[in-house]
Design a protein with these regions (language model features):
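Active-site nucleophile and cofactor-binding loops and adjacent substrate-binding regions
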Residues: 1, 47, 61-69, 89, ...
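Gly/Ser/Thr-rich active-site cleft segment
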Residues: 1-68, 154-207
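Conserved phosphate-binding catalytic cores of ATP/NTP-utilizing and phosphoryl-transfer enzymes
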Residues: 6-16, 28-31, 50-85, 107-122, ...
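Short acidic-glycine loop/turn motifs at beta-strand connectors
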Residues: 36, 48, 100-103, 136-141, ...
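Structural motif
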Residues: 42-44, 62-63, 70, 84-86, ...
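C-terminal, non-catalytic interaction/recognition modules in large multi-subunit enzymes and RNPs
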Residues: 84, 92, 145, 149-152, ...
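Glycine/threonine-rich beta-strand-loop-alpha-helix active-site module
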Residues: 86-87, 94-144, 153-155, 283-294
C-alpha cells in the first residue's frame, strides 16, 4: 500500500515477501485436508485492520495483529451501550489494550520486532504482563515480568517445577478456585492446581523480602500482602497502555466502559476499573474465545491508498473545499476497492465507502488520518482532532500526504436473545 516514507515501505515489502509464502503454504495444506479442496466454499481470513479478506488476497503484512484484531471486533460489537469502550485482553504472556468509540481506530505505521510496518492496523497496545508473568524481588523492588513462565513449565501451581507467576498470586489470594479447573496439571496431567505449592513458593519469597526489610528497619509482610503487592505492580503495568489510548489522546477515561476478556482478564478487571475510575465492567460469556468470536462477526473489507502531496487549506482558511483532482482520485480508489470486494463475492448494493485524508500541518511530521466528516470539512475536523490530542493548534497550511479509501461489506447483524435466569 503506497504511502509517504520509502524506508518504511521497504520494510513492509520485506515483511510481506517473507511471510506471504508461509501463509500460502499453510493455505494449501489446510485446503488439502478437505475432499474438494474447498473449491465450492468461501474461505476468509482476519486482517490486522479488523476486516476479513478472501484467502487468496491475504498478505503477510496484514496478518501481524489478526488475532488481537478479532478481539477488538468481538468486544466492540457486543458491548453496545452508546459509550466508548476500553478493551482489556489479558492472556498468559501479555495484555492487549485498545479503544472503540464508534469507529475503528487505526494506526498506519507500527514496529514489530524492530521492523517498521506501513499497513493499516487497529491501534492495539501490548505490554508484557499476563497470567504467566514471573514475579521477582530485585534490589528492594517488586517486579512483574517481562519474563514469562510459559505454558511449560508454567507457574508453580501447574505442578511442573515452574516459576512464581501472577497466576500463583491470584491463587493464593483466593481469586482462582482449583475446584473450578480441570485436573490436567502435573507430570501426568491428572492433578488439580497446586494451591499448597504456590503458597509455599510465595512464602519462601516473602521470607527473603522480610529479611531485607528487617535489615532496613522496615515492617514485615504476610504472604497475602506480598501477593497483593505483586498484583498491584502488574495492574499498574496494564493501566499504562489504557491511559495511552484514552487520557493521552484527550479522552475522559471515566466516561468509558471496560470490556475484559482473555484467559486472565476477569481476575484483574475490577481492580483496574477502580484505579481508573471506571464504573462499569463487561465480562463476555465467551471471554476466553472472544477473538475467535469476533472474527466470525467481522466485515469483509479492503483498502486502497496512495500519496497525494497537496495543500488542503491555507492559513486562516476555515472552510476549504476538497480540490477536484483529489475528489476524482478518491473516487477512482473507491471503484478499485469496490471491484475487489465484488470479486470476493460481496454484493454491490451493500458496500459502504469510507473516505480518509492523511493530514498534517506544514513543517511538522505528525500526521492524523481524518475520516470524511458529515459536512465535508476535513480541515476543521483535523484542527479539532489535533487540538484534542495535543492541546494546541498551529497557524500553518494543512497538507494532504495520502488519500485512503476503505470499502466495507457488512456482515449479518447480531441477533439478540435472552438468557435464562440463573
Amino acid at each position: 500500500m503506497p504511502m509517504v516514507k520509502m524506508v518504511a515501505r521497504g520494510d513492509t515489502t520485506m515483511v510481506a515477501a517473507y511471510l506471504t509464502p508461509h501463509i500460502r503454504q499453510y493455505l494449501d495444506s489446510f485446503r488439502s485436508g478437505f475432499s474438494d479442496g474447498l473449491k465450492q466454499s468461501k474461505l476468509f481470513f482476519m486482517q490486522s485492520d479488523g476486516g476479513l479478506t478472501a484467502a487468496d488476497h491475504f498478505q503477510g503484512s496484514n496478518a501481524i495483529l489478526s488475532g488481537p484484531a478479532g478481539g477488538v471486533v468481538g468486544y466492540a460489537l457486543t458491548t453496545d451501550l452508546g459509550k466508548p469502550v476500553i478493551g482489556f485482553d489479558m492472556g498468559g504472556t501479555s495484555t492487549d489494550v485498545s479503544r472503540y468509540g464508534g469507529d475503528w481506530e487505526h494506526t498506519h505505521e507500527s514496529e514489530t520486532a524492530g521492523v517498521r510496518i506501513q499497513a493499516p492496523q487497529l491501534d492495539i497496545r501490548t505490554v508484557a504482563a499476563g497470567g504467566g508473568s514471573r514475579l521477582f524481588f530485585r534490589q528492594g523492588r517488586f517486579e512483574v515480568g517481562p519474563e514469562s513462565a510459559g505454558a511449560h513449565p508454567g507457574p508453580v501451581c501447574y505442578r511442573k517445577h515452574g516459576h512464581l507467576a501472577v497466576t500463583d498470586a491470584n491463587l493464593v489470594l483466593g481469586r482462582l478456585h482449583p475446584d473450578y479447573f480441570p485436573q490436567i496439571f502435573g507430570p501426568h496431567e491428572n492433578e488439580p492446581l497446586d494451591l499448597v505449592g504456590s503458597r509455599t513458593a510465595l512464602q519462601s519469597l516473602t521470607d527473603q523480602i522480610n529479611h531485607e526489610a528487617a535489615s532496613a528497619g522496615q515492617p514485615s509482610r504476610t504472604v497475602e500482602e506480598v501477593a497483593l503487592g505483586f498484583l498491584r505492580v502488574a495492574n499498574e503495568t496494564m493501566i499504562r497502555p489504557i491511559r495511552e489510548v484514552s487520557v493521552q489522546r484527550g479522552f475522559d477515561i471515566q466516561e468509558h466502559v471496560l470490556a475484559c476478556f482473555g484467559g486472565a482478564g476477569g481476575q484483574h478487571a475490577c481492580a483496574l476499573a477502580r484505579d481508573l475510575g471506571i464504573s462499569l465492567v463487561f465480562v463476555h460469556r465467551f471471554a476466553g474465545i472472544l477473538s475467535a468470536y469476533g472474527i466470525g462477526l467481522a466485515d469483509l473489507t479492503t483498502e486502497r491508498q496512495e500519496p497525494a502531496a497537496e495543500v488542503l487549506a491555507q492559513v486562516g482558511d476555515l472552510s476549504p473545499t476538497l480540490p477536484s483532482n483529489l475528489a476524482e482520485r478518491l473516487a477512482e480508489l473507491a471503484d478499485q476497492a469496490a471491484s475487489e470486494l465484488q470479486e470476493q463475492g460481496a454484493s454491490s448494493s451493500t458496500l459502504q465507502v469510507q473516505l480518509f485524508l492523511n493530514l498534517r500541518y506544514q513543517g511538522t511530521d505528525t500526521n492524523l488520518m481524518i475520516r470524511e466528516p458529515e459536512d465535508g470539512n476535513y480541515a476543521q475536523s483535523f484542527r479539532q482532532t489535533y487540538l484534542r490530542e495535543f492541546g494546541f493548534e498551529l497557524e500553518r497550511e494543512i497538507l494532504v500526504d495520502d488519500l485512503r479509501v476503505r470499502v466495507v461489506s457488512p456482515s449479518p447483524s447480531l441477533q439478540k436473545f435472552k438468557l435464562p435466569l440463573a
